[in-house]
């Protein structure tokens, strides 16, 4: 069986589709959103994170690395991602648990076994399995095999997607799911590029195609300060959705859950110290969608 690179399997998830769900997070994403809450999801490779607070500078990790991917400079541990082979020797060597890995190759059989552990909860709550990321469609061959195995157990399947997928791949994968949780970040392609590193034409085309195929879609808008949180942005996004024919939308207020991860990955975080948004901050924003006839909720 094809293996997949997974960075988390989260049980009892209640925000990634209906009911109680198990969410399977795949590594790899074509976008580079400046506010990304899961920066460890972007790379399609295993990554090593260093927690300075736990490190005692014993340097056993440096000595254990057969690929010279780890160095210590100015009392900080640095991992060269180009040299790192993901062998995890350094992680197992560190007695202080200062090093951890993001990403692990897993067999489909193991993932299905974990997913089935909570089948009773899915059935009682109307839940199921959600594929997320990164980009849920970032590993297409693995995903097809995984879905095939999960469907043998009559599980409700959802997928979180950026929509930034080659047309042929999206057309093949999207119909496999009972629900598409489809990120819609901006109506303006240039603003979209500024915030995510990619333009939005391909995303919108895939969204339109999915709608006209009759697929179940829940558009979800991450509301991000200085990117798409103005009333004008809300109006533009509402117009985009209604022009396609969509009837509902979920708003996801900006949060700071991922800030610590950037520190551990030695990455600059563009939204450091930016205040999180609350539902009550977005009343007028929400009303723009409601005025256009959309069922808009959090």
Specify the residue positions occupied by each region the protein language model found.
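Extended, non-globular alpha-helical segments
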Residues: 50-56, 103-110, 118
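Auxiliary Fe-S-binding modules of radical SAM enzymes
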Residues: 1-18, 218, 223-298
């Amino acid at each position: 069986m094809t293996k997949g690179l997974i960075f988390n399997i989260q049980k009892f998830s209640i925000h990634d589709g209906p009911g109680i769900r198990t969410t399977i997070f795949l590594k790899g994403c074509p976008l580079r959103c400046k506010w990304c809450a899961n920066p460890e999801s972007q790379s399609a490779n295993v990554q090593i994170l260093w927690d300075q607070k736990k490190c005692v500078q014993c340097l056993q990790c440096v000595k254990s690395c057969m690929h010279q991917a780890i160095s210590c400079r100015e009392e900080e541990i640095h991992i060269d991602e180009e040299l790192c082979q993901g062998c995890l020797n350094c992680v197992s060597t560190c007695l202080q648990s200062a090093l951890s890995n993001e990403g692990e190759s897993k067999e489909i059989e193991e993932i299905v076994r974990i997913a089935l552990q909570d089948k009773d909860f899915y059935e009682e709550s109307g839940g199921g399995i959600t594929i997320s990321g990164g980009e849920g469609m970032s590993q297409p061959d693995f995903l097809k095999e995984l879905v095939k195995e999960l469907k043998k157990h009559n599980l409700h399947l959802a997928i979180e997607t950026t929509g930034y997928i080659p047309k042929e791949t999206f057309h093949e994968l999207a119909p496999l799911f009972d629900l598409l949780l489809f990120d819609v970040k901006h109506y303006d392609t240039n603003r979209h590029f500024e915030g995510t590193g990619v333009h939005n034409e391909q995303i919108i085309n895939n969204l339109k195609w999915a709608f006209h195929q009759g697929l179940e879609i829940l558009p979800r808008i991450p509301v991000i300060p200085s990117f798409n949180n103005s009333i004008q942005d809300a109006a533009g996004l509402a117009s985009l959705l209604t022009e396609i024919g969509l009837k509902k939308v979920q708003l996801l207020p900006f949060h700071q859950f991922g800030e610590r991860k950037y520190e551990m990955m030695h990455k600059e975080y563009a939204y450091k110290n930016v205040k999180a948004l609350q539902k009550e901050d977005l009343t007028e924003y929400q009303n723009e969608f409601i005025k256009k006839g959309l069922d808009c909720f959090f």
